[in-house]
Amino acid sequence: MARVKRGNIARKRRNKILNLAKGFRGGNKNLFRTANQRVMKALCNAYRDRRRRKRDFRRLWISRINASARINGTNYSKLINGMKNADIIINRKMLAQLAITDPKCFEKIVSSVSQ
């Protein structure tokens, strides 16, 4: 049976991990075993945080909408309920952007909902 030499394959596998570990601090970037652990942890965190980002941005938008709504004399829940009843379909991202960039337009939305 022929001898199987795996030097190239093993080096490619290690280099792939070490390339992913670029920018890490200390031995985490150039010692394979610790780099491998750090890369696996980083990939787990990235997977988790891709899902968490959606929640975090929604929370941010809601906070911004609530702050602007309170300036205009109402609160978030009344504003959203009024918009739903008035068939105004603007998502929270757009509403938060309006509240920051165009307060007069946001004020008109609040006044139309309050009626």
UniProtKB/Swiss-Prot annotation:
CDD domains: Ribosomal_L20
Family: Belongs to the bacterial ribosomal protein bL20 family.
Keywords: Ribonucleoprotein, Ribosomal protein, RNA-binding, rRNA-binding
One of the protein's GO biological processes: translation
GO CC, one annotated term: ribonucleoprotein complex
One Gene Ontology molecular-function label: structural constituent of ribosome
Gene3D superfamilies xrefs: 6.10.160.10, Ribosomal protein L20
Protein name: Large ribosomal subunit protein bL20
Known function: Binds directly to 23S ribosomal RNA and is necessary for the in vitro assembly process of the 50S ribosomal subunit. It is not involved in the protein synthesizing functions of that subunit.
